[in-house]
A protein has these predicted regions:
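N-terminal Sec-pathway targeting helices
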Residues: 1-15
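N-terminal type II signal-anchor transmembrane helix
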Residues: 12-24
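Solvent-exposed, non-transmembrane regions of membrane-associated and secreted proteins
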Residues: 21-237
Length: 237
């Protein structure tokens, strides 16, 4: 009788252990959808909207710094550009090798173009350049932090209002800068808008200019999944 009782206790303990192993990873994964990603990944996060890009170039002694991106309370960082998109994904703001990389602009475009694309890493480490973009899968975060400022080397400020945020898995037309699979420019932009997790009343036209921020998605982890945050130009000063 005693042996039978012990066997039952052991049996229950095994079930509890298996139950815990089964549900722990699910709970852990769900944390990634609760938007706990660090919103201060950039060192010395600025709280002002006036940036001196030339001083940033001097600070890092790197002429590849061509601008600055600032999202209040979210992101503050130089923008770098090389002859390839890959270089600054494995080099820091000084130009030294660093697997964390920097925020890099697509080599095909310039600040002020009809479409500018910025790339940066995200991952398990909290200080990766674009980890914070994964927070834009949360509607309240999306609505609260919807303005992007970009400064060029002359300190001209470009203001963008975010109108789309979504995770892309297979349609990578958004990186095209000249042709859009038969769509007009306006149709292309509305396609990006309609993919958004959250709806906005942003009106897009043939004259609209946009910025696209891309990083690897940390929500429901998987291969070839990119978090995109897209804004339309509203002001230049």
């Amino acid at each position: 009788m005693k042996k039978k009782y012990i066997r039952r206790v052991l049996y229950l303990l095994i079930i509890v252990a298996l139950f815990g192993l089964y549900f722990f990873p699910i709970t852990n994964d769900n944390k990634s959808t609760n938007h706990i990603f660090n919103t201060t990944t950039s060192k010395n996060l600025s709280t002002k909207t006036k940036i001196d890009v030339k001083s940033e170039i001097e600070k890092y002694n790197n002429p590849d710094i061509i601008g600055y991106i600032y999202i209040p309370d979210v992101l503050s960082s130089p923008i770098l550009k090389s002859t390839t998109n890959e270089y600054y994904l494995s080099h820091d703001n000084y130009g030294n090798y660093d697997k964390k990389g920097s925020i890099t602009m697509d080599y095909r475009v310039n600040i002020g173009d009809k479409k500018i694309l910025l790339y940066g890493h995200s991952g398990k480490e909290e200080d990766l350049p674009f980890l914070v973009l994964n927070n834009y899968t949360d509607e309240s975060f999306f609505k609260k932090n919807n303005i992007i400022y970009v400064y060029d080397s002359n300190n001209t400020k470009y203001t963008y209002k975010i109108f789309s945020s979504y995770i892309e898995t297979k349609d990578f037309d958004y990186v095209n800068i000249k042709t859009f699979n038969g769509l007009s420019w306006k149709e292309h932009l509305n396609k990006l808008k309609n993919k958004s997790l959250f709806k906005t009343d942003t009106e897009l036209t043939d004259d609209s200019k946009v910025i696209i921020l891309q990083t690897c998605s940390m929500v429901n982890k998987g291969n070839k999944k990119y978090q995109l945050v897209i804004g339309v130009l509203t002001n230049i000063e």
